[in-house]
Amino acid sequence: MQALERDIDINRLEKISIGLASADEIREWSRGEVTKPETINYRTLRPEKDGLFDERIFGPTKDWECYCGKYKRIRFKGIICERCGVEVTRARVRRDRMGHIELAAPVAHVWFVKGVPSRMGYLLDISPKDLDRVLYFASSIVTWVDREGRANDIDRLRQQVEEEIRQIEQDRDEEITAAQALLTKRISVIKGESSPDELTEDYADVPEEEREEAIARARREAEETIEDIKRSMDEQIELIRRAWEEFQTLEPRQIVDDEELFREMKDRFGDEYGYGVYFRGGMGAEAIRDLIRQVDLEKEARELRQVVGESRGQKRQKAIKRLKVVDAFRTSGNKPEWMILDAIPVLPPDLRPMVQLDGGRFATSDLNDLYRRVINRNNRLKRLLDLGAPDVIVNNEKRMLQEAVDALFDNGRRGRAVTGAGNRPLKSLSDMLKGKQGRFRQNLLGKRVDYSGRSVIVVGPQLEMHQCGLPRLMAVELFKPFVMKVLVDRALAPNIRSAKQMVERLRPEVWDVLEDVIKEHPVLLNRAPTLHRLGIQAFEPVLVEGKAIQIHPLVCAAFNADFDGDQMAVHVPLSPEAQAEARILMLSTQNILKPADGFPVAVPSQDMVLGLYYITYAGEDFEEREPKALLASYAEADNAYREGSLRLHDKVILRREGERIETTLGRVLFNESIERTLRGYLGDAYNPAAYRFVNHELKKGEIKQLVQQYVERYPTELVSQLLDTLKHVGFHTATLAGISIGKNDIVVPEQKREILEKYEKLVEEVEEQWEAGFISDEERAERVIGLWTQAKNEVEEAMKANLWKLNPIYMMANSGARGSYSQITQLAGMRGLMTNAKGEIIDEPVKSNFMEGLTVLEYFTSTHGARKGQADTALRTADSGYLTRRLVDVAQDVVIREEDCGTDGYIELPLYLEDGQGDPNDSVAARYLARDLVNPETGEVVAEAGTDITRPLFEAWLEELPRETKVPVRTPTKCENPHGVCQKCYGRSLATNRPVDVGEAVGIIAAQSIGEPGTQLTMRTFHTGGVSGVEDITAGLPRVVELFEARHPKGEAVISDIDGIVSLEETDSERLVRVVVTAPDGSEAREYRVERQLLRPEIVDGAEIRANTPITEGSLYPHQILENDLRYGRGTTATERYLVDEVQKVYRAQGVDIHDKHIEIIVRQMLRKVLVEEPGDTRFLPEQVADRFSVLAENERVEEEGGRPAEFHTILMGITKASLATESFLSAASFQETARVLTDAAIEGKVDNLTGLKENVIIGKLIPAATGLPKYRRLTVTVEGYRADDVDELDIAAS
């Protein structure tokens, strides 16, 4: 324990192991035994001696002061007061000094008893139910039997037993004879024939008339007495016989439920005062510990391996499970008897505090109550043992002690939870670790930090891209130590203390110093929820008045921020390293691209788009119009605009670089602003001829492309300046144009009435056909819905044609600034069809629009969909967050580890998506070619293997290669690096558009890229409108979860398990058809009965199909694809591609772009594990799930030594299971099922090598990624004007 009190350099920790603690270790950790349940004295409010807060055990409550006050001040450091026995030291030792409780009887650790499966039960091969009965004193268990002694002495024992039975029978007969003799005597006394004695005096002097009755009574009593004698003696004989029978077949670990029988056996055959000690047994943890101590782990493991090798079915499964536990104990160095505790540790008091509330009452941690229960029961048990109380009472107290310790370790695991005030279950040690409020997630993975603040955000349109506005009051508080240091350095304050006072009083000098301090000192801004890495970015602060943080309009998209009351947090990077990181890696100008797809995220939106659209707008009749002026330069254009001789949309001809450009004045002014920025940054290097004059309307999409071109062509710094220019021009123009909305801008088309009347007639005709019985109700609904959809489209077209092109509402929608045509249609056209609560379309549309107003019925019809939408959004947010958490957990340790793993594996991606739209497959870009790329038509090599596929190169291929080209590329799923991914398999970093750096945490980025758009996905299951047979097809978020968890899909398709030829056969039922697939060589055939209407069109008689070909419509089951492919030796590629493509389908349906490689990283983690079928000579167990790379490494080792390697096959795991199966127990425990993970890890004596990010965050070490890697940590940073002997701001902050 003393070692724990020394400060450990966390960053030098290499690994952490976990194991079982022996009683001796628990006593070693302890500073003293807690023997009293008292906490603090209610009068003095000081800890009680020997109690749960005792200062002698846990250390002083005040720094450098003993309990009695004899020693005060630091100069007495380390002295132990001879009066009160308290060591003079810091009070913070009360956070790590432990105590212990010596138990009067051993108790079992509830995790190992009641965990599922029961580890103790597996070790002893006792069912959990029986184990429970023994531990809680309901049954007895035999711990040892002297089989040899019993066999040798069996005849003697039989004789002794028979002799005893004979003796009892003889005694019985004698007692019966005596009873009969007494009866005879009583009768003669009643009759007056003899004189009475003591036994017969009640029957003397009976009157004549009552003698008959008295004789009858005497006879009755005699019969009862004889009956009692017979019964008690027979019971005794029966018990002895049963005990003898039981004893003859008694075996160790046998449970005896009958307490009387066990006592009888023990008295006779288990006691030296009986017939001798032939067996031992008992109840409670003591008996179980005796059994555990007898287990020979080596022998048990050998026997179990033999059973596994020889048997099948249930027996083998059980043996495998037992072997896992036995082997864990055998190899870990943990002794199994340590699962039974003789002493329990007491947590340091500051981790279970007791604080006084205002009203003089106390609030205390639940643990104190639980410890008190243990101590009370333990003390009572000690007293009972000292008094020599009967077994029944002692056993009851032992049971209560066991229950108290159970409640302390894991309340509620067995039986009813112990409750406190208000029937609330008390929080036990396990609860302290579990869940969102537990130690792992609340205090280790996420902490509150100093030097941070939060405030409401407002827009700062005057800011530059890399700046943010920080309120003065916030800044002075955040940079306090820095300001104090400079005040002292400049001799504005004599010492740190007075500098602190100056800052607190906000003296005028402070503001000047603050300006200098924050110059070039970036701060981090964060908006919750931080869904991807762009949710935290660095900015240079600019001091602003007021109390709101100002942020640049272009970073809003990355933060998903708006100004309706959002708040953001500010954090100050303190050390020079942290500042350098913030400036170089996290500055907002470095985060223009979105890591999910590599496209710009800092793109002008809303007002800026409107302004840019307006300034580049030319009008429909641009071609026909005559130019109003010929301009020789940008300067002329400026003058003409200022004078008012030309307007923004006037057509002009500009002479530029020797060419005449027909354009508008607005476009000339726009291009001038851009060129001015370029010239200002590039200076003499600027080549105007290379600049492409923008001569088209700028809508949202075009602006995005423009930014994309800037990113590809110019350095980051210039890109941010160009973005600022776009922002300025956009806001400026939008303001000057004065675009706003008025009621009269919503123009209802005159043709609307005619269109509606036309369609009402058509609908009427359909209704008549239905009434006449020509069509079914489903057909009617389908046709009516089709007609009304057409009607809405026609009204929309009429409305578009009707709107003036400079109508503000039209411009907003057309430019992509805000809103959409569908919204304008609802305002000015018709709302159209609505859905009901089930998600089905109501066939009566809303014919009105919002301008005209809805009827009551129409309004009612609209409410269903609107409310469902609201509920949906709320559910979706929670589900999406949980999905992100699971994704992060499964991929958190995937880091770029090396340059090239040298794998031959690759995949072929089509140049265009095969989704019917025929869009380019963006996921080909940002990778490396794995083989030469050959033009399939000409056969020429277009690019060589190893080529870095940049965006421009990919776009060039789209133009020159035929559509059906397949591109062979490297992929993370085929990477052979055992601990992460290599640069070549990953490709380019989408966030920086450069080859990815070694150390980049690509797993986290992948998880964020998939999780962040999760909230945009729908929740709904699509209903097929009553078509029978086809199950509801899941879409949206539930479908993504279904795929990543590798579950059976809803609406699963029937697939062929083998390669073969199809033959279709009729069945008795009209609905069903029999599909038989026969292998080409006729060796096997598979039969599937499927619904006729679900049969896929390509499944026809004689068709040749491969395994995994779907026979019916629906989604495939990924496990089945993998199983079939492995049977044919086809590897995992088909499974990987199915998962990636299906996830992509969901995201593309919502218009979300994600690069395939992110999904591939997650899929790689799902397929990392293998199932060991036959362990050979390796250290693995049969049917053990292990990491593929560790099995391969072990096989290599065994083969070198000439042994047999393990046989295994890949398995697919859902992300939750894969996270729990990770090598790191810290990571798994902080994810889910904390108690189970820690139980298993402790038994196995697991070692956490701290390779992932999570486990390092938990122990407070720098993460082994990016700048946390050793090669980056050895860099030294020199700062100008920073002297080595300066007092550091960090020292000031610490003091």
Swiss-Prot record:
Give the disulfide map.
none
The protein's matches in SMART domains, at most eight in alphabetical order, are given as:
RPOLA_N
Q: How is the cofactor bound?
A: Binds 1 Mg(2+) ion per subunit. Binds 2 Zn(2+) ions per subunit.
Q: Which gene encodes it?
A: rpoC
Q: Under which name does UniProt file this protein?
A: DNA-directed RNA polymerase subunit beta'
Q: Where does Mg(2+) bind?
A: 562, 564, 566
Q: Cellular component terms, GO, for this chain's entry? A: DNA-directed RNA polymerase complex
One Pfam family recorded for the sequence? RNA_pol_Rpb1_5
First-tier enzyme category under EC: transferase
EC number(s) given by UniProt: 2.7.7.6
